[in-house]
Amino acid sequence: MSESVHTNPSLYSKGMLAVICAQFLSAFGDNALLFATLALMKQLYYPEWSQPVLQMLFVGAYILFAPFVGQFADSFAKGRVMMVANGLKLLGAGCICFGVNPFIGYTLVGIGAAAYSPAKYGILGELTTGDKLVKANGLMESSTIAAILLGSMAGGILADWHVLAALIVCALVYGGAVVANLWIPRLPAARPGQSWRFKPMTHSFFSACRTLWRNGETRFSLMGTSLFWGAGVTLRFLLVIWVPVALGITSNAMPTYLNAMVAVGIVLGAGAAAKLVTLETVSRCMPAGILIGIAVIAFAVQQSLLPAFGLLLLLGVFGGFFIVPLNALLQERGKHSVGAGNAIAVQNLGENVAMLLMLGLYSLAVSVGVPPVAVGIGFGAVFAVAIAALWVWGRRK
């Protein structure tokens, strides 16, 4: 294994390809494991209300460990941090395979995912820089979306065949991610020697929050990415109740196909952003953010399948074009102020809090009887207005 302390000028260096491969396997395992675990819970007659609790534990791990995972990523070689995090995921999947309570096993996977995220994004800024960082983010997002698509389908298909076999495959995939991490060059720690006592660590994290919030560019990025991912999770749940009402289709598979169209669009949009947007022209992505909300409104009133597929594909393109430059901006600016690991940890906190808040508002709307079509229209309108307000505010600052 080679060791390097310099940024490699090539976008397709061995280290970068190892990062992308490890990310694909890790994200594939996350999504396959979710569906395999849900199938296990169904087989064991867990109540239906327990299924979203599984996802809440996963998201909750990000929020609970946010003050610590950024420093963890910046205190050691990020490739090794990624390996340890994938090892935790492997342990969690193994626990579920051996009959440990699935909530415990999946919580371990969530902790691993929380530790993994700052390192996987932070290392991009150490392996490449400048405009190539935007392209590297495009590769990362594209591999992630591909893993979400394939992992979700694989988890469901394998679980229909044999639940335990599906869980074992998930564990093996995490094992493959650990092996892929071995090929990532051992870069020097970004910020070694920091205190590991609880109070200094939390103080350091919230100090990083203040630093990033006071900077106009990083505040702009944090708010944009939080809105995007909060909306993305909400849309996934909205599709489940919208399909039977708007299209008259009761198949469980149809919402999955529609989600797949969004994912394909994100890959296309991420590729376009890598070619058309630089760190100096990040504001070009903002119209795409507004168009996401408009596309949701147009989608919500559809009653035919083909236009619905087309609009969700377009929505995904806008989403990919919107999110990739904002991620790159935060990594580049955060690397020089609080460290890339801390910057991504702060970003994760914002995004996961946004997910919980938006899902809470969505659940409230559904619980009081708001029709799914009206929920979609209101959701799209609020998102478009929020992004427009963020754009105007950012230009004034």
Curated annotation (Swiss-Prot):
Compartments, record wording: Cell inner membrane
* One Gene Ontology cellular component annotation held by this UniProt entry: plasma membrane
GO MF: lysophospholipid:sodium symporter activity
Primary subcellular site in the record, as a coarse category = membrane
Where are the bilayer-spanning segments?
16-36, 53-73, 91-111, 139-159, 164-184, 227-247, 253-273, 281-301, 305-325, 352-372, 373-393
Nucleus keyword on record: no
Q: What does this protein do, in the record's words?
A: Catalyzes the facilitated diffusion of 2-acyl-glycero-3-phosphoethanolamine (2-acyl-GPE) into the cell.
The record's comment on protein family reads: Belongs to the major facilitator superfamily. LplT (TC 2.A.1.42) family.
Q: What is this protein called?
A: Lysophospholipid transporter LplT
Whose protein is this, by species? Klebsiella pneumoniae subsp. pneumoniae (strain ATCC 700721 / MGH 78578)
The root-end lineage is: Bacteria, Pseudomonadati, Pseudomonadota, Gammaproteobacteria, Enterobacterales
